[in-house]
Amino acid sequence: MNGQPRLPRNYELIREIVLAAGCGSHQTAGDIFAKARERRPAIGYATVHRGLARLCELGAILKIEIPSGDAAWYEPPAPAHAHLFCTRCGELVDVDYVAPQQTLRALAQREAVRIAAAIVTFRGLCRPCAAGDGANVERLAAGKRR
């Protein structure tokens, strides 16, 4: 994080956990907390939440929230993409979609606003749920994330 303020040890650990998961991974605060506890047993849940909030403020990680959803997910900064929230199993997956710049420019001009980013989240069924095999629902019920 060149040019960024020095972070407390615990925040660095949180950042490492999110970045180590790589692009395409989406972890909840609970997932990150569990991994942090493996490496630093004394770390508290509130510390993880404060660290996630600060890292998002700095742009070191990204937060994805689903309206009316129960959780937020965190991911490393990545090239522009969208997400699909599976309404059956609750999984969040990356999808290859970027809002067309022409559409964003037209919207900004029409509404007299400046658009900094387009964050797109689709709702529907992920590939396994759309195929109807139920594997994702069973896997997630057993507490296993991708």
Give residue spans per PLM region.
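Short alpha-helical segments that sit at the start of domains
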Residues: M1-R15
